[in-house]
Amino acid sequence: MSQPITRENFDEWMIPVYAPAPFIPVRGEGSRLWDQQGKEYIDFAGGIAVNALGHAHPELREALNEQASKFWHTGNGYTNEPVLRLAKKLIDATFADRVFFCNSGAEANEAALKLARKFAHDRYGSHKSGIVAFKNAFHGRTLFTVSAGGQPAYSQDFAPLPPDIHHAAYNDINSASALIDDATCAVIVEPIQGEGGVVPASNAFLQGLRELCDRHNALLIFDEVQTGVGRTGELYAYMHYGVTPDLLTTAKALGGGFPVGALLATEECASVMTVGTHGTTYGGNPLASAVAGKVLDLINTPEMLNGVKQRHDWFVERLNSINHHYGLFSEVRGLGLLIGCVLNADYAGQAKQISQEAAKAGVMVLIAGGNVVRFAPALNVSEEEVTTGLDRFAAACEHFVSRGSS
């Protein structure tokens, strides 16, 4: 008989780069999870915007099981039918002409930044290497992507960092304009800063970046790892803004819980990449591709995308009502089902404590820094699940406020 697994085993066996919750989920269905003790949770965290169709979706299970019964992996010396079907679906649904598949958002962003450097080197010369990114951004945990993310807390322990990366203020086109010039090879930006506090870009800001990139022959990269695959009520957030990038990165919800990432590119951009310039062993494997193909089939429909916008209204209306009663938040912001509740000055820095109270009440939420409680639920979360989950969140807020005043 195997040894029982407990939360304490994490602290004993794992490299301590995470501080997970005190409970261990063991089973999920839809937007509900159950832990080892059988306690039920409504999941508004969605695996950090990953579980776009909830837990154990029957059609995703079927797609995975069907491919698992055939073959799992061959490596990049061979292609496979599921990955080619997935590539065609992404190309047909977006601006892209070409796709590179990998395993995560960080890998997709790494590929985008490498492509941008190579594009500039081949077309204009090695002097054109500057990358402009934004303060409080998050693009992944590789050395290149953590350097592009404008959060020193994630990068300062790993110096020396890759050079020629510059950070402007987000949503400030004048700040960006001061850094973008003819030596800039690329600008990388999140249409909504997720980890940075659920901060949507303005239309004018993204349009201004597009114009600056065109003027200086720089590539515009949209990091849609968190905003992509229906999260904002459009398949990709660039469609909401009406600003088309040269490169787009996607992951998280693309696999619905199965690890997969992709870089989408125009033909012109992709043309500089040749055999051997980049690669990955697992990227585009048939298991991930089969699941992701089914995810796109289910999400890229008018009914699903319009439903995201409807669910946004359910959340925002109720969160504003909760705030009316307890006075925790200065703002409820976001697009679609990426929503942030910004704590007011009286409760600054206490988002983690609120998320912990929420878990005790039976609802899972995220944070985005110390001042923002973040919601990234399944796109198909039911009205009953929204009501029940927000009832529990309201109870958590009541307990948090009463505890603080006692």
Curated annotation (Swiss-Prot):
GO terms for molecular function: identical protein binding; pyridoxal phosphate binding; succinylornithine transaminase activity. InterPro entries: Ac/SucOrn_transaminase_bac, AcOrn/SuccOrn_fam, Aminotrans_3, Aminotrans_3_PPA_site, Class-III_PLP-dep_AT, PyrdxlP-dep_Trfase, PyrdxlP-dep_Trfase_major, PyrdxlP-dep_Trfase_small. Disulfide bonds: none annotated. The modification N6-(pyridoxal phosphate)lysine is found at K252. CDD domains: OAT_like. The keyword GTP-binding does not apply. Keywords: Aminotransferase, Arginine metabolism, Pyridoxal phosphate, Transferase. Its cofactor is pyridoxal 5'-phosphate. It is an enzyme of class 2 (transferase). One of its GO terms (biological process) is alpha-amino acid biosynthetic process. It catalyses: N(2)-succinyl-L-ornithine + 2-oxoglutarate = N-succinyl-L-glutamate 5-semialdehyde + L-glutamate. It comes from the Bacteria. The keyword GTP-binding does not apply. SUPFAM superfamilies: PLP-dependent transferases. Its EC number is 2.6.1.81. NCBIfam families: arg_catab_astC, argD, PRK01278.1, PRK05093.1, PRK12381.1. PANTHER family: AMINOTRANSFERASE CLASS III, SUCCINYLORNITHINE TRANSAMINASE. Belongs to the class-III pyridoxal-phosphate-dependent aminotransferase family. AstC subfamily. Catalyzes the transamination of N(2)-succinylornithine and alpha-ketoglutarate into N(2)-succinylglutamate semialdehyde and glutamate. Can also act as an acetylornithine aminotransferase. This is Succinylornithine transaminase. The gene is astC.
